[in-house]
Amino acid sequence: MILRFRSKRGMARAEFQPTDTLAMLSAKILSDILKNDYSPENVSLCQNESDQGVIFSNLNDQTLQDAGLTHGQMLYLRLGTPNSDIASSNNEPALTVTGAPKQVSTPDVSEKKPSMPVIQDPIDDSLEKEDGLIRRSMTSLCRHGPKGMCDYCSPLEPYDESYRQENKIKHLSFHAYLRKINSNVNKYASSQSFIPPLEEPSFTVKEKCPSGHPPWPAGICTKCQPSTVMLNLQPFRVIDHIEFASPGIVDSFLNKWRQSGFQRIGYTYGHFEQYNNVPLGIKGVIEAIYEPPQVSEADGVTLEEWADEALVEQVATACGLRRIGIIFTDLTDDGSNSGKVLCKRHSDSYFLSSLEVYNSANFQTKFKNPCKWSRSGYFGSKFVTSVISGNLNGEIEVMSYQVSNIGTALYQADLIQPSVDPDRMLVKKEDQTRYVPDVLYRYTDKYGKQVSENAKPAFPVSFLLVTLTDGFPEKPDPLFSNNDTSIITTLESTDETGRLRQLAKLFDHNAIANGSLSNFSVLLAIAKLSILGKDDLAALASYATAPTEENEKNLNSRESYQTLLAILYSSL
């Protein structure tokens, strides 16, 4: 059998027997094709150009036939540092810069290994137990009985390319992508030599270079400098869909804009569930929106210091929620008195401005996604940015996005900055404190050819975006029966006695029966009184979100809750 190999050195082919082992294949490639210019530790075997591949030194004695290799198959060789460069870097001084500062490089995130076992999100642990196969029914091409199976009806892998194209799925789900990468990276490796298939991109200069030269900017070599950045459409997305538990959540958030005409911003709180519209998909279910202190204007919002952040997080945790994103408005009435708004964001302008993408990258860096399949223990983020704006028909619409992993890596390396043009992101200039690698972006021209362009000094911000879908459930079953956030404004506009009096009305028997406590803003207002302890607040949250007889008895048995009732009733 003849196998073909492609690498940065060109094309080559070699003849093997089906009974030859992978170890024999690697030895022949190193000697006959690479002319012993590379060591086994610096060459990886890949099935396609996007794979990380398997290092030659990790290939075992599995036969080529058992490994699934066929006559004429194209394989790819990922080449590392040649032996000549390794020898020269060990014997010769690296490039130095006279008079440069001693130490200004940033840590290489990808080199960090998790020091403790990674605790993933429950949704990730749950999806890892799913087989993820796409079931297919019998077709007219099948020639077997109901208990048989053939190529036309056998289940497909969750990352099957034909299924993705037929169903117009733009991005693979994260777990489908993970299985695709893992099957390629660890296909030939034994169970004793597992290789983490995921690695977060890093575009910073490595601090501890094995060449022994002074750190950047006093010295740099091919081992420690970041590689060229190629901006492409990210093939996967960590979150596939955003679902608002009820339309009232968005409607309540929009009320302040309707009343003032000023823009608003808020943090979304919810949880993650499996999304069945794509194989192994994840959706974020938003149950509440909290609006932090802000200065609103007609054309933007400025966030102020958030003193109650820890308390809001505590209340959210008590309700079984977590912060999953941020949402803001960009609405301008079109002046027709018909309820329609201007369409500002579309394919000919922008979807998220460069400043918004920059801020989203900042949030995604703070809220990383723990992942045991990554070398660093983290991969991507589940933090989602949603914007409420006008569509092409002048209707108010929610659109959700994430910044790609390369986008967040560029932000972490301090290589990008927003520009005055909302559709363009600037690449920063290199200086004594910042090494800037080559940045390219690739697009399809009018002739259908792939064209690469230099991203300096600026590039389209759309290359950093990942688009999500969003919507509402067919049968809403929200965690909170009441989404009115005006209670916060009412309480903040009165004195202490007035606040207690307003809260006391919510504990009336008839009011409780109508769901007065089933409101995230109300629970937060009660928590601000500092009467209930952490466990008692959790008991109140359990009753507010699930008003069962058992939860009611548990709440009434708590001394601090009775103290709260006494204080509130005394204000009436």
UniProtKB/Swiss-Prot annotation:
Membrane topology listed for this record: Peripheral membrane protein
Location, primary (coarse class): cytoplasm
Residue segments, region Disordered: 87-116
GO biological process, one term: ribosome-associated ubiquitin-dependent protein catabolic process
Entry's localization field: Cytoplasm, Perinuclear region; Endoplasmic reticulum membrane; Nucleus membrane
Keywords: Cytoplasm, Endoplasmic reticulum, Membrane, mRNA transport, Nucleus, Protein transport, Translocation, Transport
Organism superkingdom: Eukaryota
SUPFAM superfamilies xrefs: Ubiquitin-like (SSF54236)
Nucleus in keyword set: yes
GO molecular function: ubiquitin binding; ubiquitin protein ligase binding
Pfam families to which the protein is assigned, alphabetical: NPL4 (PF05021), UN_NPL4 (PF11543), zf-NPL4 (PF05020)
GO cellular component, one term: nuclear membrane
MPN domain location: 242-379
Family according to the record: Belongs to the NPL4 family.
Function summary: Involved in the import of nuclear-targeted proteins into the nucleus and the export of poly(A) RNA out of the nucleus. Has a role in the endoplasmic reticulum-associated degradation (ERAD) pathway.
PANTHER family: NUCLEAR PROTEIN LOCALIZATION 4, NUCLEAR PROTEIN LOCALIZATION PROTEIN 4 HOMOLOG
Protein name stated in the entry: Nuclear protein localization protein 4
Source organism per UniProt: Schizosaccharomyces pombe (strain 972 / ATCC 24843) (Fission yeast)
Lineage: Eukaryota, Fungi, Dikarya, Ascomycota, Taphrinomycotina
Gene transcribed to yield this protein: npl4
